[in-house]
Regions:
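C-terminal or internal capping secondary-structure element at the end of a domain, subdomain, or sheet
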Residues: 361-382
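Short loop/turn motifs at secondary-structure junctions and domain boundaries
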Residues: 354-359
């Protein structure tokens, strides 16, 4: 049975406010750059037979809250991993038919003292809910899970099962997205078709529609933009060459290649086939973050004196759970990222294009008015 992993980069949703540049990072901060780097590193640490769905946006917000309490080399490494970006609270463009929301929280053990300034920053700049509870009480786990469920419309429920005795604080971000397609698929056109997955062929429910889409072909791949109502958010689907091993998709997650492909998108008549899918997965992001240079935070040299005078503190587990449901009417997606802190010692082409997504592919859900990527995914089996 194939394994499925949901990363906080599952579908890509871009936020409104551009990131703040940080002097410690050699390049100009870009949320797209962070999102693609995060997605690429998640893929590198995933098993070959795993689907990957992540929310780079949710991970970025949670890590930004952690960075506010970091100092010294620990802060430098976190800033660099974030590509110099700070994902502070921002409006995400909810409309009459499109629902996009993000919520933040910080949970503090009642035996642990947090600096007032740190809590003030989280409350004022990240609109975070700060709650002090007894971490030894099992009801605290339920309270955190209830908060996650409430802010993902019940799509992400049991985020944690226990709080180890050395955990004194937990940060959480929840993001929820629900939007109808600008041009919906006709359910009567949906039929059983073969998806040529990495582990073999399998019948799936394939949605079909012929219409006008922004479309591009580059480096042997195809890209299509499928807009949602309001035309602010879109899903970008990338169909790599049929003979490409999905372990080698790094080229298509290169920022310059991705941005060049988006600029190449041009109106075309497309016969589109897109599989229906509902995926729920969870992921531990520790290995991913270490591969992005966040090393000091996990050891005895961690510097989180901006959080508390009690210590020393170090980074515990960074985890993410995701959900995505793609149907004829639209898309619903949700993600929760948790961070535990431990006390330790081109021109239009009028030809009809065909884009049958019946083999492994990449997708991104983006906010075209901003530099955020909320969800991204690599689907190799259905």
């Amino acid at each position: 049975m194939k394994k499925t992993i949901i990363y906080s980069a599952a579908a890509l949703l871009c936020g409104i406010v551009s990131c703040n540049n940080v002097e410690t990072h050699p390049a100009e901060g870009s949320r797209t750059g962070f999102a693609l780097s995060f997605f690429k590193n998640v893929n590198a640490s995933a098993e070959p037979d795993e689907n990957v769905v992540v929310s780079p946006y949710s991970a970025g917000v949670a890590l930004s809250m952690l960075t506010q309490g970091a100092e010294g080399q620990t802060k430098v490494e976190l800033d660099n991993a974030l590509n110099g970006c700070d994902f502070k609270a921002e409006p995400l463009g909810t409309g009459d038919t499109v629902v996009v929301r993000s919520a933040n929280s910080v949970w503090i053990d009642d035996d642990f003292s947090v600096r007032n300034h740190y809590v003030d920053v989280l409350e004022k700049e990240y609109d975070a809910l700060a709650t002090t509870l007894n971490f030894a009480d099992p009801a605290t786990v339920q309270a955190i899970n209830n908060w996650c469920s409430e802010h993902t419309d019940g799509k992400v429920n049991e985020v944690i099962s226990q709080l180890p005795s050395n955990i004194v604080m937990m940060l959480a971000n929840a993001v929820y997205f629900k939007a109808p397609w600008l041009d919906q698929f006709n359910e009567r056109a949906t039929k059983d078709e073969v998806f040529h997955g990495q582990s073999g062929d399998r019948n799936v429910r394939m949605m079909n529609r012929k219409g006008r889409y922004a479309y591009a072909e580059y480096q042997g791949a195809k890209m299509i933009e499928i807009p949602y109502e309001g035309d602010r958010y879109s899903m970008y689907v990338i169909l790599p060459p049929a003979d490409l091993n999905m372990k080698n998709i790094g080229t298509y997650l290169n920022q310059s290649v991705y941005e060049s492909a988006v600029k190449m998108l041009a109106p075309a008549e497309v016969r589109l086939s897109l599989p229906k899918m509902k995926i729920e997965t969870s992921l531990n992001l520790n290995k991913t973050l270490k591969s992005m240079g966040v090393v000091t935070a996990y050891g005895s040299a961690a510097d989180f004196k901006g959080i508390s005078a009690m210590g020393p503190l170090s980074l515990g587990d960074v985890a993410q759970k995701c959900y995505i449901d793609v149907t004829e009417s639209g898309t619903e997606a949700a993600a929760v990222t948790t961070i535990s802190v431990a006390l330790t010692s081109a021109r239009p082409d009028m030809d009809v294009k065909v884009m049958k997504i019946d083999r492994p592919f990449l997708f991104l859900i983006v906010d075209k008015q901003s530099d955020n990527i909320l969800f991204a995914g690599k689907i190799i089996d259905l």
